[in-house]
Amino acid sequence: MFSNQYIQQRIHKANSLREEGKNPYKNGLKRSLTNAAFLEKYAYVKDLEGPKDKEKCESIVGRVKLLRLMGKACFIKIEDESAILQAYVSQNELNDEFKSLKKHLEVGDIVLVKGFPFATKTGELSIHALEFHILSKTIVPLPEKFHGLSDIELRYRQRYLDLIVNPSVKDVFKKRSLIVSSVRKFFEMEGFLEVETPMMHPIPGGANARPFITYHNALEIERYLRIAPELYLKRLIVGGFEAVFEINRNFRNEGMDHSHNPEFTMIEFYWAYHTYEDLIELSKRLFDYLLKTLNLDSKIIYNDMEVDFNQTSVISYLDALETIGGISKEILEKEDKLLAYLLEQGIKVEPNLTHGKLLAEAFDRFVEHQLIHPTFVTEYPIEISPLARRNDSNPNIADRFELFIAGKEIANGFSELNDPLDQLERFKNQVAEKEKGDEEAQYMDEDYVWALAHGMPPTAGQGIGIDRLVMLLTGAKSIKDVILFPAMRPVKNDFNIESEE
């Protein structure tokens, strides 16, 4: 694993430190300031030739990013999470320790410097070293940079290298953290209670998706990694909670692309005595809050598209298919005509698809990618909404919406089905679809139906994909760019590939 010549050279230097009585993985030394705090505290220091106040001694830590040796002195760029700070190390102060430093120190090593502030002749605030310690000897040379597409997979597989080399990547994940904490704060301010529900389910449910299956040895039964927390959260509404939310992982055993990862983060929230129309207004307030928190304008650029949050609109499913998708009502209303139309357009359609699923195929193909500004699409076909409340005026549609931004689904919400008999029939229909070969159809969950039978108040519920939300608000083009360790196909690692030194 460590046979590479450059790695061997570094291992030799680590052993050489041990021979000098120095631990190359020293512990217990503390910094007094972050690099950013040092730069802020001593910003007034400008004069190299003026008196140096060695009493103002600080300790800083970080990774060596640049090393310039110049005889009896050297300049070192040291980076911690907050900033890069230059250190000046001279043989005059360190004596024999300076010789050891020159012999052993390399780019990538993690160090501690204790010293006083001063400014170079160019006016750069630096730390003048009085002590220097290697805290962690890096034995694998770091890459200087990544070279575009050829290294994208390496960035995802070895995210730690990506974070070391590309500061902008770290910024994305800091912004992700801010987005998640802001979403949490928003719902707390709205009066919602954060809860946690099981990650392993006896029956997969809450969404149309294929589950991951595992096995519980003690109980001797199969368990399913959750595809959605929905049915457990609605059990809490039955139990008397009136506004709950959960931010956590879901797992779906399906394909991967630039907007899908099998392990992803969602927020789901449920609100008793409210309707899906209330959720639409709540969603608008949420985005207003996020844009203000992140100091973003109401117009943002994503994938070369201008998204204007001031142009938020609401449109029904069929109207969107007609006015945006360009399909006439005559075709949309007849199952046989719609099937023929899709086939004429070269769309491969699975046999025995229901009218509602044919409409969904048409929507995915002709409408979704055109929804650039925030668009709430309402009145979904009941056949593709097995957990949503049936509309009072039209039993063929559900009181449901999905939010699309920049051509992608961001949220899904609806007034919840709380009629246990209707829910039982919907589950039976889903089971029939599964028996016909639909792997994504939902399972029968009699325990959930039994919970509904105890009475669930009128409730509205919604899910928002956090990863896609972060993509939108950071401009990331792939979901892998906003997940620290995305799912990747396993490869045999060659840890001895020659590195540029």
UniProtKB/Swiss-Prot annotation:
Location of the protein in the cell: Cytoplasm
Any one of the GO CC terms: cytosol
Domain of life, per lineage: Bacteria
Keyword Metal-binding in annotation: yes
Record key words, sorted: Aminoacyl-tRNA synthetase, ATP-binding, Cytoplasm, Ligase, Magnesium, Metal-binding, Nucleotide-binding, Protein biosynthesis
GO molecular function term, any single one: magnesium ion binding
Cofactor(s) of this protein: Mg(2+)
Gene Ontology biological process: lysyl-tRNA aminoacylation
Catalytic reactions on record: tRNA(Lys) + L-lysine + ATP = L-lysyl-tRNA(Lys) + AMP + diphosphate
Cofactor note: Binds 3 Mg(2+) ions per subunit.
PROSITE patterns registered for this protein in UniProt: AA_TRNA_LIGASE_II
InterPro entries: Aa-tRNA-synt_II, aa-tRNA-synth_II, aa-tRNA-synth_II/BPL/LPL, Lys-tRNA-ligase_II, Lys-tRNA-ligase_II_N, Lys-tRNA-synth_II_C, NA-bd_OB-fold, NA-bd_OB_tRNA
EC number: 6.1.1.6
Positions with a binding annotation for Mg(2+) 1: 402, 409
Residues engaged in binding Mg(2+) 2: 409
Subunit structure, as described in the record: Homodimer.
HAMAP family named among the record's database cross-references: Lys_tRNA_synth_class2 (MF_00252)
Family (UniProt): Belongs to the class-II aminoacyl-tRNA synthetase family.
PANTHER family named in the record: LYSINE--TRNA LIGASE, CHLOROPLASTIC_MITOCHONDRIAL, LYSYL-TRNA SYNTHETASE
NCBIfam families: lysS_bact (TIGR00499), PRK00484.1 (NF001756)
Protein name per its UniProtKB record: Lysine--tRNA ligase
Organism in which the protein naturally occurs: Helicobacter acinonychis (strain Sheeba)
